[in-house]
Swiss-Prot record:
It comes from Aeromonas salmonicida (strain A449). The keyword Nucleotidyltransferase does not apply. GO terms for cellular component: cytosol. InterPro entries: MTA_SAH_Nsdase, Nucleoside_phosphorylase_d, Nucleoside_phosphorylase_sf. This is 5'-methylthioadenosine/S-adenosylhomocysteine nucleosidase.
């Protein structure tokens, strides 16, 4: 099995890259691709850059040039569930956009025109992730909705609107639904796994800066364990 792994930031891919066996490197379209072996699997590790457009470009290039059997998005997120803490994990069962609004044309809030309202994650990948979490037993883990948008959610009004629009949302980040949309269009199974670097409404900028490496490490450890079971 060939696995594509996408992280937006250096802190989200550094540990994974350090564990790869002599990866070959390709820089293309502002993205970096590292191809090699990790946990016994052929892996293409991708540093996409931040945001929906960067994630879409990276995912499209990854799928077109390397043809992985599945894609896993790793990294950090901001927690929205009241009982989540920094370092806790969220496994997405589906991804939605929180900053898309074409409801004037009869679409759901968050639904892009001519696209589904949500991009479901692959059930088999979810099950593998849950097994790994159960074995680790280190962090609280939830499975549910993660939403994506091109904004860092630190303003009270934006947080309140997101909660009202998506009351079931567990976490928010800036790439996952874009990756999900591209995988949907290419018909490739995918999964988003995120560790919490900050919690909505709780000194988020300072928290993110302090804990992004911790969140990246937790998420990377989870991915390595998953690879051993795929």
């Amino acid at each position: 099995m060939k696995v594509g792994i996408i992280g937006a930031m250096e802190q989200e891919v550094a540990l994974l890259r350090s564990q790869m066996n002599e990866p070959t490197t390709l820089q293309l379209g502002g993205c970096e691709f590292y191809q090699g072996k990790l946990a016994g699997k052929e892996v293409i590790l991708t540093r996409s850059g931040i945001g929906k457009v960067a994630a879409s470009v990276a995912t499209s290039l990854l799928l077109e040039k390397f043809a992985p059997d599945c894609v896993i998005n790793t990294g950090s997120a901001g927690g929205f569930a009241q009982d989540l803490h920094i370092g806790d994990m969220v496994i997405a069962d589906e991804m939605r956009f929180h900053d898309v609004d074409v409801t004037a044309f009869g679409y759901e809030m968050g639904q892009m025109a001519q696209q589904p309202a949500a991009f479901p994650c692959d059930g088999k990948l979810i099950a593998v992730a849950q097994d790994c979490i159960a074995e680790q037993g280190k962090h609280q883990t939830k499975v549910g909705l993660i939403c994506t948008g091109d904004q860092f959610m630190c303003k009270p009004d934006a947080i309140a609107k997101a909660r009202a629009d998506f009351p079931q949302m567990l976490a928010v980040e800036m790439e996952g639904a874009a990756i999900g949309q591209v995988c949907h269009m290419f018909k490739v199974p995918y999964l988003v796994v995120r560790a919490m670097s900050d919690i909505a409404g709780k000194e988020q900028v300072e928290s993110f800066d302090a804990f992004i490496e911790v969140a990246g490490q937790h998420s990377a450890e989870m991915i390595i364990k998953m690879l051993g079971k795929l």
